[in-house]
């Protein structure tokens, strides 16, 4: 690929908090060399959208890769000049003086292959046909994403990350980095994640995919040519997923059994506030997300299982890691329960690998990793202080 210029944030066009990274501008990185995929096929001439925050130091030792979860993107922090409301999905974590302090670290966010936020994916034009890939876009895996991310690191001249960090699906990518490129990261930070999906989690994903596949507007994944979008299926898929991201405690506090109107109407329309909330979330998601991308990413979640190649033995799988680990879970997260994080911790301890573990008592379920709970952020801040001291940042 062509040489990469290290971008700087665009000048602020409006007032922002002093701990914001400011107005940011993504860059499109093009890779001509084919990327061999786990399924045996290859993809060539692909693009990845990238955002960076902070300054890469002279020896390029202060870089941190932030891996995104299902519906997120490269836009980790800051705002865009033409859309102040589009705040980065982890803006409370990344910025000057924040836990991942951009005064000390150079932070990279990458939109994964197959996504719908600018990187090559099902919505992109297939050079072989001149039409969108649609259903023809190859199935990708967490491992494929990590290989693509490694090429981004190469383009920036980064031989070793100070840390690779992610929550949920992003945490799986961080684990994969520690296994596939063990000498290219000093620290691996895994938050609200799991070393593999349970049968229940795969089942949730299957129900969500079925909602999309059964939408009459899906057209076998080639709905772009029909000028439609399977919004009904996407809406239901998001509603299913959103239920799993919240805890029972959080839902009870937010909604309880509160009615949308004063009286019961004895109908199948929205009666309860929680129904209204789910429909709102589903409608919003269906407007901006792509159905084929949803299928791809949930399948990548399903396939991730580093222990599979080792007879199901996670301890054997993690033996090749060299990084120090921070693993964090949330007590009310039932999507990726603390017990799943402890499986990873045990495998690391069995291999005598350095690992710190924290289970945070937060009421917000799986989505707690996106929120700014003081205990959680203090943990992250302390760990990054340690990394900064190690590398002299």
From Swiss-Prot:
Q: What is its EC number?
A: 2.3.1.46
Active site per UniProt: 168 (nucleophile), 333, 366
What biological-process GO terms show up in the record? homoserine metabolic process; methionine biosynthetic process
Where is the protein situated, by its record's location annotation? Cytoplasm
| A GO MF label | homoserine O-succinyltransferase activity
Its annotated pathway reads: Amino-acid biosynthesis; L-methionine biosynthesis via de novo pathway; O-succinyl-L-homoserine from L-homoserine: step 1/1
Q: What class of enzyme is it?
A: transferase
Which residues are marked as site: Important for acyl-CoA specificity? 335
Residues annotated as coiled-coil are: none
KW Cytoplasm (keyword) present: yes
UniProt keyword terms in alphabetical order: Acyltransferase, Amino-acid biosynthesis, Cytoplasm, Methionine biosynthesis, Transferase
Gene3D superfamilies the UniProt entry points to? 1.10.1740.110, alpha/beta hydrolase
What would be one Gene Ontology cellular-component term for the protein?
Answer: cytoplasm
Which top-level group of life is the source organism from? Bacteria
Q: Which residues form the AB hydrolase-1 domain?
A: 62-372
In this chain, substrate is annotated as bound at 238, 367
Primary location:
cytoplasm
Cite the NCBIfam families for this sequence.
Answer: homoserO_Ac_trn, PRK00175.1
Report the function annotation for this chain: Transfers a succinyl group from succinyl-CoA to L-homoserine, forming succinyl-L-homoserine.
Q: Which family does it belong to?
A: Belongs to the AB hydrolase superfamily. MetX family.
Name the UniProt record assigns to this protein: Homoserine O-succinyltransferase
What species was this sequence derived from?
Answer: Cupriavidus taiwanensis (strain DSM 17343 / BCRC 17206 / CCUG 44338 / CIP 107171 / LMG 19424 / R1)
Q: What is the lineage of its organism?
A: Bacteria, Pseudomonadati, Pseudomonadota, Betaproteobacteria, Burkholderiales
């Amino acid at each position: 690929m062509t040489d990469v210029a290290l971008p700087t944030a665009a000048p602020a066009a409006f007032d922002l908090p002093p701990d914001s990274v400011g107005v940011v501008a993504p860059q499109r990185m093009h890779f001509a060399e084919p990327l061999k995929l786990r399924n045996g096929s290859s993809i060539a001439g692909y693009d990845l959208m990238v955002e960076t925050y902070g300054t890469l130091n002279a020896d390029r030792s202060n870089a941190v890769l932030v891996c995104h979860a299902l519906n997120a993107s490269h836009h980790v922090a800051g705002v865009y000049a033409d859309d102040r409301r589009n705040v980065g999905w982890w803006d409370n974590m990344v910025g000057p003086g924040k836990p991942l302090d951009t005064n000390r670290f150079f932070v990279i966010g990458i939109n994964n292959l197959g996504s719908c936020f600018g990187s090559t994916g099902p919505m992109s034009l297939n050079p072989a046909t001149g039409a969108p890939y649609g259903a023809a876009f190859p199935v990708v895996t967490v491992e494929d994403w990590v290989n693509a991310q490694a090429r981004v690191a190469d383009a920036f001249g980064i031989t070793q990350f100070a840390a690779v960090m992610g929550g949920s699906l992003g945490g799986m990518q961080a684990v994969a980095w520690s296994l596939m490129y063990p000498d290219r990261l000093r620290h691996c930070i895994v938050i609200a994640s799991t070393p593999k999906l349970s049968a229940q989690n795969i089942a949730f994903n299957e129900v969500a995919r079925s909602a999309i596949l059964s939408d009459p507007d899906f057209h076998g994944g080639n709905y772009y040519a029909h000028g439609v979008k399977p919004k009904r299926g996407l809406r239901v898929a998001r509603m299913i997923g959103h239920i799993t991201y919240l805890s029972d405690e959080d839902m009870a506090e937010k909604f309880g059994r509160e009615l949308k109107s004063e009286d019961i109407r004895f109908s199948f329309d929205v009666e309860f506030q929680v129904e209204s909330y789910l429909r709102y979330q589903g409608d919003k998601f269906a407007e901006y997300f792509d159905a084929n991308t949803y299928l791809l990413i949930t399948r990548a979640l399903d396939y991730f299982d580093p222990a599979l190649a080792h007879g199901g033995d996670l301890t054997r799988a993690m033996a090749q890691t060299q990084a120090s680990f921070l693993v964090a879970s949330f007590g009310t997260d039932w999507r990726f329960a603390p017990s799943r994080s402890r499986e990873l911790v045990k495998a690391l301890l069995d291999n005598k690998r350095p690992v710190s573990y924290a289970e945070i008592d937060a009421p917000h379920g799986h989505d707690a990793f996106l929120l700014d709970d003081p205990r959680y952020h203090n943990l992250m801040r302390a760990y990054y202080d340690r990394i900064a001291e190690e590398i002299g940042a």
